[in-house]
Design a protein with these regions (language model features):
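N-terminal cysteine/histidine-rich coordination modules
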Residues: 1-83
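Charge-enriched, short contiguous segments at helix-coil
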Residues: 159-166, 170-220
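A long, hydrophobic alpha-helical segment
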Residues: 97-113
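Hydrophobic alpha-helical packing segments in soluble, helical-rich domains
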Residues: 116-137
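Residues in soluble alpha-helical coiled-coils and helical-bundle/repeat scaffolds
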Residues: 113-116, 135, 152, 180
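Generic structural signal for hydrophobic core residues of well-folded globular domains
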Residues: 112, 129-133, 196, 200
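A structural motif
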Residues: 92-100, 162-165
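Short, charged amphipathic alpha-helical segments flanked by flexible coils
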Residues: 73-86, 134-166
Length: 220
């Protein structure tokens, strides 16, 4: 990711790593600090770190990036950097998920700044994962409960699901009125959806890759 640092603002960031809003206005907080020069690459790279604040959510992001070093090793004030990492990192849906679930979860992560939309999309991702495992009938709560009874999910996962709002139509408790999802609602369902995908797809895929690698090494 290449960004431009002009007028104390960051240009070129596609989404805020904190709230997910597209094309955020992020302003620099404090100086751009030189970190080190590495000779691992040619031209040599001068690394910097700096912080910025999203004008939409108000949260702070730490960035680490580099530019080609000049003859003196570095420039005093870089204007263009290649960003290698941000903290927090920009969330993305795991590639091991079924295509439909991956699409819905990615859209949900990118809609964190709009909790109602994030809630709906995350619920759709959960629905897609459950259907992929053969659980097609009933509410999300009912299907998660059935998958727990069958040993597909753990009892703890089922309890977690009942502790959060899975959709606007399935309130957590006995809410008299639903005025819309909160940021906390969105964060909780996103955390659950990512964990569900990790448990059902990502971890089994990692185990399978490890088994295949171990088998290949034994054959050598």
């Amino acid at each position: 990711l290449s960004i431009s640092l002009l007028d104390e603002e960051l240009y070129g960031i596609k989404r805020c790593p904190q709230c997910g809003i597209a094309h955020p206005l992020i302003r620099l907080l404090g100086p751009i600090t030189f970190h080190y020069v590495t000779e691992q690459y040619y031209p040599h790279r001068a690394y910097y770190y700096f912080t910025g604040r999203c004008s939409h959510c108000g949260h702070v992001i730490l960035f680490n990036g580099y530019q080609n070093a000049d003859g003196n090793g570095r420039e005093q004030k870089p204007e263009h950097l290649q960003i290698e990492r941000s903290y927090p990192d920009l969330d993305s849906a795991a590639e091991e998920l079924p295509e439909k679930a991956q699409k819905f979860l990615q859209q949900a992560l990118e809609s964190r700044h709009a909790p109602d939309g994030a809630l709906m999309l995350a619920a759709s991702a959960i629905d897609a994962m459950l259907k992929d495992k053969g659980y097609r009938d009933g509410t999300l709560f009912a299907r998660i409960g059935k998958s727990s009874e069958d040993g597909v999910l753990t009892e703890q996962m089922a309890k977690w699901a009942h502790a959060i709002r899975l959709s606007a139509n399935e309130p957590r408790h006995a809410d008299d009125e639903f005025d819309g999802a909160t940021q906390d609602d969105a964060d909780q369902i996103l955390a659950f959806t990512k964990a569900l995908g990790e448990y059902l797809y990502v971890l089994p895929a990692k185990v399978e890759r490890w088994k295949n690698k171990a088998g290949d090494e034994e054959d050598v």
